[in-house]
Curated annotation (Swiss-Prot):
Disulfide bonds: none annotated. It comes from Phodopus sungorus (Striped hairy-footed hamster). GO terms for molecular function: NADH dehydrogenase (ubiquinone) activity; ubiquinone binding. Pfam families: Oxidored_q5_N (PF01059), Proton_antipo_M (PF00361). This is NADH-ubiquinone oxidoreductase chain 4. The chain crosses the membrane at residues 23-43, 60-80, 93-113, 114-134, 147-167, 188-208. It is a multi-pass membrane protein. The gene is MT-ND4.
């Protein structure tokens, strides 16, 4: 996993040290190289989990999401060049750096083994996303959109945090690998339905 995360992080100094006229082509071309590395590294044809470390791993569900995230960066760079071509060089590089930061956070989110780490990384994506919406949004209502995005995300994330704490107190772990080994029969109760609603609400709020 480090062979994907570290090159992605190194795109940030590449952005700031590149010539202003070549920053787009440099970052886009190197991000395509990272895409090829990720395609070879994360390609899985079965459901067996690929362990990279005690904190990060991928399976047949997280691998496609991670590859999709990595492929989105060069596509976003290609799609947004015309939109911010009149911006200053500093603003262009800041915009690219925020996109790279967002990609790194999402890669770590989809490959996290601990649910609490997944929660922290998932909510950390709020910061670069909020800055991109409020600073480079195309509509005049971008400030209101950023404000709504912030409050809706916070409202949805608090029940998710409470649900994770409840699961930790009940089962004694939030490790996804260990939770998958729990084969004890579970009888549906009203509290389990509330926990399910609290977990799903944080993701449903971010869908728009």
């Amino acid at each position: 996993m480090l062979k994907i995360i570290i090159p992605s992080i190194m795109l940030i100094p590449l952005t700031w040290f590149s010539n202003n006229k070549k920053v787009w082509i440099n970052v886009t071309s190197y991000s395509f190289v990272i895409n090829m590395i990720a395609l070879v590294t994360l390609w899985q044809v079965n459901d067996i989990t690929t362990n990279f470390s005690t904190m990060f791993s991928t399976d047949s569900l997280s691998s496609p999401l991670t590859m999709l995230t990595i492929w989105l960066l060069p596509l976003m760079l290609l799609a947004s060049q015309k939109h911010i071509k009149n911006q200053t060089d500093f603003n262009k590089k800041m915009y690219i750096s925020l996109l790279i930061t967002l990609q790194v956070l999402l890669i770590m989110t989809f490959s996290a083994n601990e649910l609490i780490m997944f929660y922290i990384l998932f909510e950390a994506t709020l910061i670069p996303t909020l800055i991109i919406i409020t600073r480079w949004g195309n509509q005049a209502e971008r400030l209101n959109a950023g404000l709504y995005f912030l409050f809706y995300t916070l409202i949805g994330s608090i029940p998710l945090l409470i649900a994770l704490i409840s699961i930790q107190n009940t089962l004694g772990t939030l490790n996804i690998m260990l939770l998958s080994l729990d084969s004890s029969p579970q009888t549906p109760t009203w509290s389990s339905h509330i926990l399910w609603l609290a977990c799903i609400m944080a993701f449903m709020i971010k869908m728009p």
